[in-house]
Amino acid sequence: MGKRIIGPHEDLTRRIIAAALAVHNRLGPGHKEEVYQHGMEVQSLHDGLAFAAQKMFEVFDNGVLVGYYIPDFVYEEEVITEIKAFAALPQRYLGQVITYLNHTGLKVGLLINFGARRLQVRRVFPSRQAAKYPVQYTWLFIPDWLRVERAAHPPSGPRGCA
């Protein structure tokens, strides 16, 4: 029998997976991604998991803000979690979570697919090459009300790196 490798934040990832299983058992497959995201919010609150939904991470290029990474959830400032709802999970979403990890400096992510008959969960770790590059990104949580205001009035000109 193969030996299971214990990853970073093992207890937390198990609790997140347990929450996802509870949501999937109640709702089953076939819903839109947003339904599962809301279900995870409700279940995570019920289970006492601290999380930020749709947390925005600024991305800079040569000191200029060029965009944001917006993972579905960041649990306890430690685990990035992406929710999907596909019958079969496309491989490109694994790369999305790896990119989030590489650029935030977090050590583990979860890619959870609710769309299949059975819940699909992948624990994801940053690429080894990410350690070569210093993290040059600022973590920024922007409330929903401010995001709407910023979208209505986009920034003009270059912005400095924090």
Predicted regions and their residues:
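Histidine-centered active-site/metal-ligand motif
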Residues: H24, H31, Y93
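Active-site metal-binding core of divalent-cation-utilizing nuclease and nuclease-like domains
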Residues: P29-E78, F86, A116-Q129, T138-P143, ...
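Interdomain/boundary linker segments immediately adjacent to catalytic/signaling cores
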Residues: M1-L27
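Nucleic-acid nuclease catalytic cores
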Residues: I80, K84-K132
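Extreme N-terminal tail/first-helix region
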Residues: M1-D11, P134, F141-A152, G157-P158
